Amino acid sequence: IRDGACTMAALQDLGFHEEAHAFLGFIADRMAAAPLQVMYGIGGDTELPESTLDHLSGYEGARPVRIGNGAVRQRQHDMWGWLLHLMERDLVGRDVPVDDRSWADIQQLAAEATDHWRLPDQGIWEIRGAPRQFGSSKLMAWVALDRAARLAERRGEPETSEAWRTEAAAIHDDLTTCGVDDRGVFTQTYGAPALDASMLLVPLMGFLPGSDARVQATVLAIADGLTDQGLVLRYRPDEADDGVSASEEGTFTICSFWLVSALARIGKIDRARALFERLVAFASPLGLYAEEIEPATGRHLGNMPQAFSHLALIGAALDLERATG
C-alpha cells in the first residue's frame, strides 16, 4: 500500500493522474472484498507466505533469499495516511467531486486511523521486533485525518470534517508532546533518543512548516548524526531492535533524497543542492537506483531498481526547483 501510494503521488507530481486513479480503483476493489491489509500480490493476492530458499544466494553470496513477505500480517498504522493523501490529490487534481464510493472508502480509512493511532505498530520500516510507538506512524495517522477532513469539506460534510479535524489535532498534540526529545528533535519512538530518517516527513507532509524550530533541529540532527559520509541511514541498527540483524546496512537512497527535500524546506538550499548533485552522480548508466548505496564505493545494494528511491528523486528535484524559483 505504502510503496504503491507513494509511487502514484510522484507520478501525480509529474502530471500523470490516470495511473493514480487506476491504483485507487484497485485498492477500492480490495476494500470492498475484505478488510484492507498492508500489502497484496500484483494480482490482488492476499496470502503471501514467506519462506527462504536455502539453495540460493543473492548478490555476492547474500543470504537468506526470501520469497513472499512475512510483513503481510503486520500492523503498519501509516498506510491509511498514504492512501488518504493520495485520494485527496487524485480528487483535487482531477477536479471532481467526492463520489459515493470514494466517500465510503474515506470514512472507512479515517475510522481505522482514529481507532488505531494510539496503538503501537511495526512502522514504516516493517520491523520484526516488538511493536512500538513510532513517531512516523503517528505522523501519517495525522495525515490520514487531516486529508479526510479536507475531503469531507469538499463533499459538503462540515460536521464530519470538524470531527476529523479534532482527531487530527489530538494526534498533533500527542506527537509534539511525546515524540520530541530535550533537544527539540523528533525521534524514532516515544521516550527514546534514537533518530529515524522517516521523521524528515514532518515538513514534507505538512505537519509543521520548515520555519519551525523543531523541524530545523530534526533535519539538522539527521543530516549530522544519521549519515555515513553524507548519505542517510534509515536508523542505526544498534539503537533499534528491528528483529532482523544488528549488523551494518547501507545508506537508504530514499532517505538521502528526503534529506534533500527537507533541507530545501528549511532554507538550506546550497546544502540541499550539493547532496542532490552527489546523489545524481551515483545513478547507474541507465539512471537507475537501488534501495541502498554504499557511500565509500558508490556501489548499489538491495532491491534494484527500487521505486522508493526514484519517487524520492522526483520529489527532491521538485522541492529544489520550488525553493530556488
What spans do the regions from the language model cover?
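Aromatic- and histidine-enriched alpha-helix N-cap/loop-to-helix transition segments
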Residues: 1-6, 15, 29, 74-82, ...
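Substrate-binding groove/exosite segments of carbohydrate-active enzymes
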Residues: 1-53, 57-67, 74-84, 88
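Well-ordered alpha-helical scaffold segments within catalytic/enzyme domains
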Residues: 4-18, 82-97, 140-157, 201-211, ...
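A structural signal for alpha-helical segments
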Residues: 15, 97-101, 129-136, 156-163, ...
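Extended glycan-interaction surfaces of carbohydrate-active proteins
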Residues: 35-74, 102-103, 108-121, 168-253, ...
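Aromatic-lined, polymer-binding surfaces characteristic
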Residues: 77, 99-162, 197
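Heptad-repeat coiled-coil/leucine-zipper interface motif in alpha-helices
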Residues: 137, 164-167, 171
